[in-house]
Amino acid sequence: MQLLAIGINHTTAPVSLRERVAFPLEQIKPALGALRTHLSGRNGTEAAILSTCNRTEIYCATDVLKPGEEGFEHTLRWLAQHHNVPASELAPHLYALPQSEAVRHAFRVASGLDSMVLGETQILGQLKDAVRTAGEAGALGTYLNQLFQRTFAVAKEVRGQTEIGAHSVSMAAAAVRLAQRIFESVSTQRVLFIGAGEMIELCATHFAAQTPRQIVVANRTVERGEKLAEQLSEQGLTTQAIRLQDLGDRLHEFDIVVSCTASSLPIIGLGAVERAVKRRKHRPIMMVDLAVPRDVEPEVARLDDVFLYTVDDLGAVVREGNALRQAAVAQAEAIIDSRVLNFMHWLETRSVVPVIRELQSQGEAIRQAEVERARRMLARGDDPAAVLEALSGALTRKFLHGPTHALNHTQGEDREALLRLVPGLFRHSSHSER
């Protein structure tokens, strides 16, 4: 069975490319079906898709593809075709990790070692969601199930035995730091949050600690926006929830805009921001776009009075705290190295299961045939002792026929290998079953 992890992330591709190969949640299940059919021509391949702001990754287990370039090329072609992105444009940014490298990568991702925010925990929840979705789509089997269960166990071990999450600067905290560099005080600013998901909740919590002048939440579902606004108002803040369609009329009111929705298209265009800046009499506005695909048209960054930051821009701020956790990284890598070896041992033992089953099947067929022959001998009145002798002799001859034939007809290095191997296979053990 071949394992393969293929994908792009924040270290290999800019957000402008990552957003083009992101999978909306509602598209993942049908995409898994299409991927498995593409790779094997049938639904024999196991697969899972992890798609976040910082990465799009495909994990596969298949016995159809050959290891190496074939698996990479097949998966690359499917990913490029699915998203209508030229394969030649995508390929330089992709990593393809086979076997133990794929296992190590999964362990590192879940443990937060491959994240923009070193040691962050959000990725573990996102990976669990991806595995749950793959399971619901019927795309998981023995190998990926085992891989991901061990992945979650390793992540728990790493976080429990190291300080990988200590001194962590989250994306939300990084957004606040950037705001503090632009504005003398966040407490005098009006802040708009677009969306009401987990990332927006985290950002809102961090900004709320700076007691801004006002916090407004814009969301497609106004009830969800109201819920977040009410939570923030309990901290003594002035809050409000508005409908997303009212954004154009209100955008000019805000000094800081933080957006993270699941929209596949930008929801804030260049024209809307130009009008907002004009109504603000060119007072600066800071915009933080944490969405992938992006919520704000990239052209907005060209405006003189707008400070637009994407998830990649926040990465530099996040990395400032990463150096403080290098000792924890070394400890985490040591744990992962050990657990990768354990998993690969399990994988290797799985490869002999079909051989063992075939041996057992052949042995059982021989046994049944000889027992039936012995019964016929007993039925016609043959001496039981002679029947037992005949039975045991026939079993011995037939069980040893294969090894004996191989020893007599194999030459060279293969014969030498058999001469070393066969005695051990038939050596009597005091612990063997009786």
UniProtKB/Swiss-Prot annotation:
InterPro entries linked to this entry: 4pyrrol_synth_GluRdtase (IPR000343), 4pyrrol_synth_GluRdtase_dimer (IPR015896), 4pyrrol_synth_GluRdtase_N (IPR015895), GluRdtase_CS (IPR018214), GluRdtase_dimer_dom_sf (IPR036453), GluRdtase_N_sf (IPR036343), NAD(P)-bd_dom_sf (IPR036291), Shikm_DH/Glu-tRNA_Rdtase (IPR006151)
Keyword NADP tagged: yes
Active-site annotation: C53
Keywords: NADP, Oxidoreductase, Porphyrin biosynthesis
PANTHER family: GLUTAMYL-TRNA REDUCTASE
Further comment found in the protein's record: During catalysis, the active site Cys acts as a nucleophile attacking the alpha-carbonyl group of tRNA-bound glutamate with the formation of a thioester intermediate between enzyme and glutamate, and the concomitant release of tRNA(Glu). The thioester intermediate is finally reduced by direct hydride transfer from NADPH, to form the product GSA.
Main function: Catalyzes the NADPH-dependent reduction of glutamyl-tRNA(Glu) to glutamate 1-semialdehyde (GSA).
Domain topic, free-text comment: Possesses an unusual extended V-shaped dimeric structure with each monomer consisting of three distinct domains arranged along a curved 'spinal' alpha-helix. The N-terminal catalytic domain specifically recognizes the glutamate moiety of the substrate. The second domain is the NADPH-binding domain, and the third C-terminal domain is responsible for dimerization.
Family the UniProt entry places it in: Belongs to the glutamyl-tRNA reductase family.
Full protein name: Glutamyl-tRNA reductase
Natural source organism: Cupriavidus metallidurans (strain ATCC 43123 / DSM 2839 / NBRC 102507 / CH34) (Ralstonia metallidurans)
Chain's gene name: hemA
